[in-house]
Design a protein with these regions (language model features):
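N-terminal glutamine amidotransferase
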Residues: 1-114
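Contiguous alpha-helical scaffold segments within structured protein domains
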Residues: 115-119
Length: 119
């Protein structure tokens, strides 16, 4: 089952998000990720597997302190568990996470492809 954590404040968003996702581990998941604002945009870090893998990736990156971000744990319902399929999904300006199945994904994808978006 998926879990979502968001934070805006004075503390380290990275730490708050990881702590929050840790509290949701009992729900089960196959991948995890975070999107954290940075001066030059949004930094997204995702990983298949346990939260400890995501935590290790973040420690290696040593991102600058930020007070804003979102985190997600995913239980795959569409697409295999992978770094690519993990949430958050992002552009340079926005990151999103969601729980559940987007029933009309086919129609939405067709509209976006017609507008020039690629998948």
């Amino acid at each position: 089952m998926c879990g979502i954590v968001g934070y805006v404040g004075m503390r380290s968003a990275q730490q708050v998000l990881l702590d929050g996702l840790e509290k949701l581990e009992y729900r089960g998941y196959d991948s995890a990720g975070v999107a954290i604002t940075q001066r030059d945009g949004i930094r997204v870090v995702k990983s298949k597997g346990r939260l400890s893998t995501l935590r290790s990736k973040l420690e290696e990156l040593a991102l600058p302190q930020s007070g804003c971000g979102i985190g997600h744990t995913r239980w795959a319902t569409h697409g295999e568990p992978s770094d690519v399929n993990s949430h958050p999904h992002s552009t340079p300006r926005v990151s999103i996470v969601h729980n559940g199945i987007i029933e009309n994904y086919g129609a939405l994808k067709e509209r976006l492809v017609a507008k020039g978006y690629t998948f």
